[in-house]
Regions:
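Acidic, metal/ion-coordinating pockets
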Residues: 1-251, 308-315
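Non-catalytic terminal accessory segments
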Residues: 144, 250-345
Length: 345
């Protein structure tokens, strides 16, 4: 939620986070009334100090059971974790007769252990990551011991193989199979589950919306879907258990003739929460940074060399050359990769 668009970069690199500032995405999440959240790999892109300043503005807890300060301990439950591994929140449910019951929900979070490679410059020497499934097997029994009626995994990990392997990046299926987890909210791979792209994948039932037999959902990316897990539960022998479930990834728009057509109305309060920073971001990206001697276009960006992509690559090459000047690496060849981020104008 911190990285991936101009606003994220503007806040991190230009405006910054002063004491008391609330990040616009956190402001929106506060407005929506989030009960809990976890960290994705991109939350680490701007460094730990920036991330901590952002999280301080949240009116809800963040949890993550597999990122530890310094070095890992001998056992997961001895790790000095960067964030609390889990939280137990009080909820109210109404039965078929209209009676209300108190329910304790255990919410535990996980992020891909590969962040140590992806953000090495920020994380090396400061934190270490533990295998997602290993952490879950250690902490889920503890959550049950503390009285959680149901345990839901908030897992920024994709849906990969059903066969467990240590330090899996996409560990949703082995994670869901951990005893004591009742449901899983997964992500990372920017797809939607249940959905046709996962038909026939071992460990999944797209029709039932289950991952390793547990209700699960993956809600696309960039707010493209709302993930819904609707549980039917019953109390038996003093304990709550899931008897059936329905999961759905509800899209917020549909594609009609190459256009996005909204399926829901915008919430004015959420728009207002981010309005000032949205407008500041627009003003920032609309500033002139230079002038070209020839017009640039991106009409053929997806099929051939393109001036709009080439100028980005040239700028990157120049910048790295400046950074390496006078160093032991100054004579090394520089390779620059640039992507066609837009086409047609």
């Amino acid at each position: 939620f911190l990285q991936g668009n101009p606003m994220g970069d503007y806040i991190a690199y230009e405006r910054g986070m002063k004491e008391g500032d609330v990040h616009p995405v956190i402001a929106a999440m506060n407005t929506l009334g989030y009960a809990c959240s976890t960290l994705g790999n991109h939350e680490f892109n701007y460094g730990l100090s920036f991330m901590d300043k952002v999280l301080a503005g949240a009116n809800f807890p963040f949890v993550c059971a597999n990122v530890a300060r310094g070095q890992l301990a001998a056992q997961p439950r001895a790790d000095d974790l960067w964030l609390p591994p889990y939280v137990i929140v009080d909820a109210q449910v109404t039965d078929g007769a209209g009676e209300t019951h108190a329910l304790k929900l255990g919410l535990i979070g996980f992020t891909p252990p590969q962040i140590m490679s992806w953000d090495k410059r920020h994380l090396e020497g400061n934190v270490e990551t533990r295998d997602i499934v290993e952490a879950a097997r250690a902490w889920v029994p503890r959550i049950r011991e503390e009285g959680a009626d149901l345990v839901i995994a908030l897992a920024h990990t994709g849906i990969g193989s059903d066969a467990y392997a240590p330090m899996m990046e996409n560990a949703a299926i082995p994670l869901a199979a951990v005893e004591g987890i009742d449901a899983i909210v997964t992500g990372h791979s920017h797809l939607d589950f249940p959905g046709p792209k996962y038909e026939g994948v071992a460990g999944l039932d797209v029709g039932k919306g289950t991952i390793a037999g547990k209700p699960g959902v993956m809600a696309g990316f960039w707010g493209s879907h709302m993930g819904l897990i609707d549980l039917m539960i019953e109390r038996e022998g003093g304990q709550w258990r899931v008897v059936s479930a329905q999961t759905e990834a509800r899209p917020i728009y549909e594609r009609v003739e190459r256009n996005n057509v909204p399926l829901v109305e915008s919430v004015a309060a959420v728009e207002e929460a981010a309005r000032a920073d949205h407008e500041a971001t627009l003003a920032y990206v609309r500033r002139a940074v230079g002038e070209t001697s020839a017009p640039l276009h991106s009409y053929f960006a997806l099929v051939a060399d393109d001036p709009s992509v080439q100028i980005v690559s040239n700028a990157q090459t120049w910048y790295i050359g400046q950074m390496l000047a006078g160093s032991e690496h100054a004579d090394l060849p520089i390779l620059s990769a640039a992507a066609p981020f837009k086409a047609g104008g």
